[in-house]
Amino acid sequence: MIAYDLSEPAVVSRLEQLGPRLKILIDDSGDHGHADSGETQATQRLRISAGPANVKRQHMGQLQHNKTIVVEGPKVKMAVCGSTNYTWRGFFVQANNAVVLRGKNAIKPFVVGFDQYWSTETPAKFANTASAAWTSLGLDGINAMVAFSPHSEANPVLKFIADDIGTKTTSSLFYSLAFLYQTPGVMLDAIKKVSDDNKVFVYGISDRKVGGLDLQKPDGNVSPVFPSALGKKLPEPFKSEPVGGSGNRMHHKFLVVDFNKPTARVYLGSYNFSDTADTKNGENLLLIRNRRIAVSYMIEALRLVDHYHFRVSQQEAKSTRTRLQLAIPPRLPGKAAWWSKYYTNPLKIRDRE
C-alpha cells in the first residue's frame, strides 16, 4: 500500500488487523512529517502491528502522492488507485474517484511499481525503472496502461498527454482537474489551444487554490465560483458542508477525450497533470482507451460542471441585473426562438449534440 494522506481511523484500524501481511509506504513531506500528524501516528501504530521493517516513510522529490492498495492473495488479486486519499475528507467531502482492477495481470505493474518505490529514494533513479514507462494492464477487451511518476525530463509523460489533447482532440474534451489554473505549463496551454477550436466542445472544472472553483464554459471563458455563492441559500445538510482550504470540493484528476468517438480515452489517477507530478512526485496515472469507461467519466464531469455552471449563471444574472428564468417560445412570426442558436452557433451545436 502507498498512502499520501492517511488519517481515517477506520482505515488505520483495518490495516492494523493485517499484522505482518501489510507492507506500506507513507508520505512524510511537509506537515505529514510532523510528530503529531495523522500520518506519523498511523506510522507508529502500524510499525507495532506490521513490524518496523514493513513500514517506510518517503516523499520522493517532493511528495509520495500515490493512493494505491494492492491485494495479492490466493483468491483475491486486486489493485485500487485513483485520486481518493485515505482521510475523512477524501471519502466524505471531496469529489473523488477510484478504480478497482482485478486479476493477476492487472495488479502486476502495481506490485512492481511498489517494489521500485520501496528500493528507490530519488526521482532520478526511479525515472530509469520500467515502472516509469507505460505498461499494459493486460485486461481482456480493454486497452489500459499505467505509468508511475517521477519521470525523467528527457521522457516526460506530461508532454505526451499535452500533445494528445492539443493535436488529436477532434470532438470533445471534458476535464475535472484539481488546481489546473495554479499549475501553468504545457497542459494548461493544450487545454487553452483546444478551447480556441470552435469545432471542439470543451467543458471543465478546477479547484481554486484560495477557495471556490474555476469553471470553464463551452465558450472558452473561465469563471470563478466562490465559496459564498456555493453555500448561499442551500438547505441542510449541504449548507454546513466543510469549507476552506484547497481541494476541498473538487479533488478529481481526470481528462476525457472524444468520448463519443471510437478513439475515446480517459486519463486518470493521483497525477495532477503538472511538472511537479511528472518529474518529482510519486504518482500513478492510467490511460484507458475504452469508450464505455470514457463515457462514465464524462458523465461525472458533466454532473459536476453542469451544477456549477448554473451557479455561474446565477452570478452573471445578478451582476447584469437580468432575470434568470425559463425562456418562452417566440410570440411573433419571424422572431428567433431561444433555441435557434443551438442550430447555428458551432459551440452551441456541440453543446446540443
Features from the language model and the residues they span:
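Active-site beta-strand/loop signature of hydrolases that rely on acidic residues for catalysis
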Residues: 2-3, 26-27, 173-177
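Short linear motifs in intrinsically disordered/low-complexity regions
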Residues: 6, 29, 37, 141-144, ...
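Aromatic-Pro/Gly-enriched surface loop or interdomain linker
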Residues: 93-97, 101-161
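PLD/PLD-like phosphodiesterase catalytic module centered on the HKD motif
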Residues: 12-92, 100-107, 118-119, 171-172, ...
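N-terminal carbohydrate-binding/catalytic regions of secreted carbohydrate-active enzymes
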Residues: 1-11
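Domain-level detector for secreted/extracellular nuclease and nuclease-toxin modules, and
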Residues: 4, 177-179, 346-350
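Glycine-rich anion-binding loop/nest that anchors nucleotide
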Residues: 3, 177-178, 254, 270
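Beta-propeller domains
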Residues: 132-204, 210-211
